[in-house]
Amino acid sequence: MDKVKHSKIIILGSGPAGYTAAIYAARANLDPFLITGTNKGGQLMNTNEIENWPGDYNKISGSELMNRMYKHAIELKTKVICDTVISVNFKKNPFFLIGENNKYTADSVIIATGANPRYLGLQSESLFKGKGVSTCAVCDGFFYKNKEVAVVGGGNTAIEETLYLSNFVKKVHLIHRGINFRAEKILLDRLEKKIKSQKIIIYLNSIVKNILGNSSGVTALLIEQKNSKEKTESKIQVSGLFVAIGYTPNTNIFVNKLKMKDGYIQVTRQEHGNYTQTSIPGIFAAGDVIDHVYRQAITSSASGCMAALDSERYINSLV
């Protein structure tokens, strides 16, 4: 490893939250480092078309949007470092970080390492990712207008995705491995109304065995349903599959270092600034590591902006 590299602000993560934080920190003349991590560009790199980014009504790919953010950050003199931080020491300032390639110190750290959606683990799932298999109905649902789709999951996210899709797709097939949904009652009440309208078909005690398709994308699912005495297999014709079985925040290295809940970093959300401060002053968090509800590119960018402003205020207080 080279000698220790120091920056006033080090940003961990290269998704919308990380790059937005870098842009704001650079404009404040804080000369930020942005350490990309292994998942460069974040989840958006797997999104073929984005139709809800303000100002880009002609659609934009996730990779194109992230490339724009990268160029913007570079133009403002952000130092983008291709490394992955594997260990941190937040006990005293300057904070100490160890990467696979270098060691770093910083007066303030912004954690924007994101979260990864959980998948079913099928080989065919990887084959059709971005070609019919998605983890975000708000991002990709509109492409299936007047088509039949399936949703897998049994919690709040799965029910919310199902209800959202049912507003414009032809039919939603909701597949759940259990016999009872884990969602809130208000969501289940809405689901019941949609079922009566025959917009949603429920498959309980069921799992997806295989995803079928061709070069154009997904065409059908092979599902297995467990009855009291036997298992039966059936095929349903769909154009898309939305996997909604949860997310895993990329926060393992912060366990026992920061206050967390279910893997998500807890922030103070104070009324007058420090909305993104973690349990340690000077350490801030943004994007999907703090958000298990909205998970949109624009909300991640917004929290990245707030984290940079909070971090700037903290650094100024050290002078």
Swiss-Prot record:
Cofactor-binding details, from the entry: Binds 1 FAD per subunit.
Disulphide connectivity of cysteines: 136-139
> Which is one GO molecular function term here?
thioredoxin-disulfide reductase (NADPH) activity
**GO annotation terms (biological process):** removal of superoxide radicals
Cite the binding residues for FAD. Answer: 36-43, 288-297
The EC number of this protein is 1.8.1.9
Q: Which cofactor does it need?
A: FAD
Keyword entries, A-Z = Cytoplasm, Disulfide bond, FAD, Flavoprotein, NADP, Oxidoreductase, Redox-active center
- Entry keyword annotation includes Flavoprotein: yes
Q: Where is this chain's protein located in or outside the cell? A: Cytoplasm
GO cellular component terms given for this protein? cytoplasm
Query: What reactions does this protein catalyze?
Result: [thioredoxin]-dithiol + NADP(+) = [thioredoxin]-disulfide + NADPH + H(+)
User: Quaternary form?
Assistant: Homodimer.
User: What NCBIfam families is this protein classified in?
Assistant: TRX_reduct (TIGR01292)
**What family, per the record?**
Belongs to the class-II pyridine nucleotide-disulfide oxidoreductase family.
- What other remark does the UniProt record contain for this protein? The active site is a redox-active disulfide bond.
Q: From the Swiss-Prot or TrEMBL record, give the protein name.
A: Thioredoxin reductase
State the organism of origin: Buchnera aphidicola subsp. Acyrthosiphon pisum (strain APS) (Acyrthosiphon pisum symbiotic bacterium)
Q: What is the lineage of its organism?
A: Bacteria, Pseudomonadati, Pseudomonadota, Gammaproteobacteria, Enterobacterales
